[in-house]
Amino acid sequence: MVNVDDLKKHDPPEHRSVSQYNVVRQCPYRYFLERVVKVWSKPAAWFPQGTAVHYAAEVWEKSGRTMSLEDVKAEYAKAFAEAVNKMLDETPNTDFWYSSGPYDGLADIERRFQIGLEQVERYVDYYARVPDEVIWVAPDGEPAIELEFEVDYDGVKVKGFIDQVVKYVLNREEAVKPRDVKTGNEPSGEFQLATYADYLQQEYDLTVVEGDYLMTGKRGKKQAYIVEYDLSEWTHERLKEEYQWADDVIRNERFEPDPDPKKCHFCGVADSCIYRAS
């Protein structure tokens, strides 16, 4: 087990991210274990599933949506295998992987592979049903797919990538909004999309009032669907307060534990945590 007092003061990264914020907001001590001590993190087959679906979507979009579904699935399969093999290199015994319901670690790898294939198909099908929703092209001529961004919140730099920025019609006028592709069961809420929207407003002077998640669904679901969020209350100042709070926690090493049975169950570093709730 690891204790904060046993370590020397760490050198935090120079930038923040949505994922850093989310971890600190959920449990500062988890951030300490994951990002500072970098203890072993329990693998789960849903991680390569998500990575591979995102990669396949990116490849298809960059083809101008002309790549055949079979070729997109082949790209998915390649990315899935690479991601799984990388995780197996670190934790070759799948008995130590997360199980999912009745499926142990090994069985869940195969199950998640099949779920991801269906999600790739649903992703392509979604845009076949709504072809007017196209990827926004940035002023530099590049389509906004995996768009790298950086926002400065009074000295706190936030970096990351936006899955995609799409054009759509709002009140009979052309508008844009950030979209995140989700392979899990639940959307991630407003904060992530609000950060993306703020970047688009700061960098490109775009008016962005909403964002959404493209939910590729569970296995057996027929179609992907959209979950929208109104982002109008997320101002630059409000986001600045949140990121400055997270930055303060990290830089001043205020890694207080916040144990909770539900959170701890899905925490990949719970096995190294002295505060774990059962």
List each model region and its residues:
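Charged, glycine-rich intrinsically disordered N-terminal tails and low-complexity linkers that flank
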Residues: 1-75, 79
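Metal-dependent nuclease catalytic regions and adjoining charged, substrate-binding loops involved
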Residues: 5-6, 154, 188, 201-278
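An acidic intrinsically disordered interaction segment
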Residues: 7-26, 154-164, 232-240
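Catalytic phosphate/metal-binding cores of nucleic-acid and nucleotide-processing enzymes, i.e., regions
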Residues: 24, 32-36, 139, 158, ...
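A short beta-strand motif that forms part of the nucleic acid-binding face
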Residues: 37, 181-185, 215-217
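A non-catalytic, helix-rich entry segment at domain boundaries
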Residues: 56-147
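Charged, terminal alpha-helix-loop-beta segments
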Residues: 118-122, 142-148, 152, 262, ...
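Non-catalytic protein-protein interaction segments used by genome-maintenance enzymes to assemble
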Residues: 139, 144-198, 204
